Amino acid sequence: VRDGRGRPRRRSSQNPGRDGLIGDFAAVAGGYLTAFLRAEHAGAMTMSDVSETDFAVIVYREEDHWEADALPAAVTADLDGFVQALRRQPSIGGTTGFAGVGDDFWLAVRVLGEDVSMFLSDLTAAVDYPLARQVLEALDIPVPSDDELDQVLPAGDLSIFADLGLEEMELGAVAADLDLYPEDAVAGIAERLRFGEAVERALDLALGS
């Protein structure tokens, strides 16, 4: 099955779904949403830029355990804003952010001091989505041409989670699985990295499921 651009679709005929705990994350979201509204008023972004993102979550380390929070989709209106949102969160060993758009693509970003690592599940998403296009620009990778859209290929640092135990081949295999929704791909990665429960809760909040 292919999408409107003739690319293989990521979505399978049945979404396995996930059960999770739902809580109030207004306190977490408030600061980020306020920053977004100020930027929107200044003309830096529009609601149409934001609406394409289905979820954004942040993962960070506190003493001896992992924490994860849902973020407003507004923080992924542009890549710089997403990175800055991750930098604002104090953490032992840096922060990780995940974002997903429909059944098209997902993005992982790790921030440690001034170092930023990124992994984009499908570089052809840059044809349609500004966030994906900005990732390719940051990686100095050209946006695919029309005759390069037949194959879904990832872009970025395949070793982004190698220090946490996820090898390059494993991450590549997740990105290549066209039957996974972005949220399920992210949940699977998080489980492998031993912060699965925290990310599941954050995804449930972000997706309202």
Regions found by a protein language model. Name each.
Residues V1-G20, A27-G31, A35, A39-A42:
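Compositionally biased, low-complexity flexible segments
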Residues R5, V75, L139, V143:
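Solvent-exposed, flexible loop/coil residues
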Residues E40, E67-P72, L120-S121, V174-A175:
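Charged, low-complexity surface segments at secondary-structure and domain boundaries
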Residues H41-L71:
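Short, extreme N-terminal leader segments that mark the start of a protein/domain
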Residues S48, A70-D128:
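Compact, well-ordered interaction domains used in eukaryotic information-processing assemblies
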Residues A56-I58, F98, V135:
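Generic structural hydrophobic/aromatic packing signal, biased to beta-strands
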Residues V127-S209:
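Charged, compositionally biased boundary regions
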